[in-house]
Regions:
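Catalytic domains that recognize anionic headgroups
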Residues: 2-558
Length: 558
């Protein structure tokens, strides 16, 4: 099978230089000397329904709202997965999890599937990642493949761009080199800690949690990373860089634990410091990741629910506030006119809905309906709001179409399916009134196996009670959404009139249920066929002796 990777590698340099660019999704092609910069912002763990521009009653997001008003907003964007690793893998490959199979913390992405950063780098882009989530940089899963520069703010020993180093040049270079060496030593150790079931059981002990949350920079540093990003982009602009730039940004502010600044607590939870029960609950809950991830045996109390949701809103507002300087830079006419900006999330958060607080096992919209805001170069499609359901995996197709890559240049004119056809899978097709997928979208909730093992060890009765070991999938068409558990229809919702998914219609709509079940069956068959010939995601296996040697070198063991 001729793949995107093989085609890009075979293209001569002169052909890459003459790649044509689609203008706003039109059929006409227009040659240009300048490819657009691309900025992909993933606001980790952000629910769409907590942004004001998505209809939320509280003013949580004035800066995002203002940016959305100048852009295109997709009202029903669905993440292909319910947690970080498979969701990002789908964004980076344009594939659903059943195809890319990067679904577990110990999976390494298949090299036959080209990543977005690789594709852009192959056609002349500089590629840089600013990431706050350790699962995308510290864990060795290859999701950072294709990036020339990777700046990690999560995990031990964060690294920052040289422009952020205020020390004298020589001192700064020496310090950066030492940091790189230490990172090369500690990264396999951190990776082992992240995926070892025994270590995970120890790590969730409440009195140990604050230690790794702080010293392993669990949430990274949103404020610092955004400051560095703006500085990096401004410096590059002032230097007159000739190559186009792809910038990936992951921010973790809305992920537990919740600890927003006091000014945002006063706005959204003014009672928090005065009501001891509320304060003590949240301080304790922040240090109980096992409770975040586990299905709830009983709902939180009214007080607990209120403080959890209010502090989440405060975190949303704080992150929005921090984004203002980046938006100011992106709103410069010279930047705005030739930059594709995409804002989305990998998943949402349960927040005491449907028996969950976190984002691990289920496929409800609390977890998989995410924001998707796109500002095209020249602000094409400005102000449009799109109600057609779309998958965020189509970010991949949209970005590659924007730089001129289309199916006739990727697979010799052979279109294997609409899932790989960049010309028809780009979001611009939906904007032009003819959605290539007919408004049909899927999501897949692969159970994180490390979490499943933890639940089995800590509270095995919950596994059966909540069917934790069974995979969930969902299909969307029109107003309806069908959720299957273990490949059997389980719940049917009219998500337009029942957005909270409280009224299960599966007994009332047998025809709709059967149609959506048929779509899901066909989808899984097609997704499995689309895997590369050698496909099984590589299960990362560290050399235990190598890890032990590095632990000894750091003085952790003898």
């Amino acid at each position: 099978m001729l793949t995107l990777r093989h085609t890009l590698q075979a293209m001569p340099a002169e052909a890459l230089e003459q790649i044509e660019i689609f203008e706003g999704g039109n059929q006409q092609m227009k040659k240009t000397q300048t490819k657009p910069d691309i900025i992909l912002i993933v606001l980790d763990t952000l629910r769409a329904d907590r942004l004001s521009c998505y209809g939320y009653s509280r003013e949580t997001s004035p800066y995002i709202d203002a940016f959305a008003a100048e852009s295109t907003l997709f009202e029903r964007a669905i993440s292909p997965a319910q947690w970080t690793i498979p969701a990002h893998a789908s964004i980076f490959t344009g594939e659903y999890p059943t195809t890319h199979l990067t679904t577990q913390i110990y999976d390494r992405h298949n090299r036959e599937q080209i990543m977005l950063a690789e594709a852009l780098r192959n056609v002349g882009y500089n590629t840089v990642s600013f990431c706050n989530n350790p699962l995308l940089g510290v864990v060795e899963n290859d999701l950072d493949r294709g990036f020339e520069e990777v700046y990690l703010y999560g995990g031990a020993l964060p690294n920052r761009p040289a422009i952020a180093d205020a020390r004298p040049r020589l001192t700064g270079r020496i310090a950066q080199r030492i940091t790189r060496v230490m990172r090369s030593i500690t990264r396999p150790i951190q990776d082992r800690f992240a995926r070892d079931n025994f270590i995970l059981r120890i790590a969730v002990i409440p009195w140990l949690v604050p230690l790794w949350q702080r010293y392993a920079n669990f949430k990274g540093n949103t404020a610092l990373s955004l400051r560095d990003i703006v500085g990096y982009l401004r410096t590059r602009r002032h230097k007159g860089a000739e190559q186009p730039l792809f910038t990936f940004i992951n921010l973790m502010e809305t992920h537990l634990p919740f600890s927003p600044p006091k000014r945002f607590i006063r706005r959204f939870a003014p009672y928090y410091r005065k009501e001891r029960k509320a304060y003590r609950f949240m301080q304790s809950y922040n240090h109980k990741p096992f409770d975040w991830m586990m299905p709830l045996t009983e709902p939180l109390t009214e007080m607990q629910d209120r403080v959890l949701n209010d502090l989440y809103d405060a975190e949303v507002a704080y992150e929005d506030h921090l984004l203002r300087h980046l938006f100011a830079h992106l709103n410069r006419p010279s930047v705005r006119d030739n930059t594709l900006v995409i804002i989305t999330s990998d998943h949402g958060e349960g927040l005491n809905r449907h028996d969950f607080v976190g984002h691990s096992l289920v496929a409800y919209d609390d977890l998989v309906r995410v924001p998707l805001i796109v500002r095209f170069p020249q602000q094409r499609y400005k102000g449009m709001r799109v109600s057609t359901p779309v998958s965020t995996r189509r970010i991949f197709h949209t970005a590659l179409e924007a730089v001129g890559l289309q199916h006739t240049g990727l697979d010799n004119g052979r279109v294997e399916s609409t899932l790989t056809n960049l010309e028809t899978s780009s979001l611009t097709r939906t904007l032009n009134g003819g959605d290539p997928e007919g408004g049909i979208v899927f999501t897949e909730a692969y159970t994180p196996e490390t979490l499943l093992t933890l639940i089995k060890n800590e509270d095995p009765e919950r596994v059966a009670a909540f069917r934790c070991n069974l995979m969930r999938r969902a299909a969307y068409q029109g107003n309806y959404k069908l959720i299957t558990v273990g490949d059997k229809p389980d719940e049917l919702f009219d998500v337009v009139h029942d957005p909270d998914e409280m009224d299960n219609l599966i007994g009332d709509e047998p025809v709709v249920t059967a149609e959506l079940e048929k779509l899901l069956t066909a989808f899984v068959e097609e997704a499995e066929k689309r895997r590369p010939a050698n496909q099984e995601a590589t299960r990362v296996g560290l050399d235990d002796e190598l890890v032990a040697e590095r632990l000894r070198g750091l003085g952790y063991i003898e």
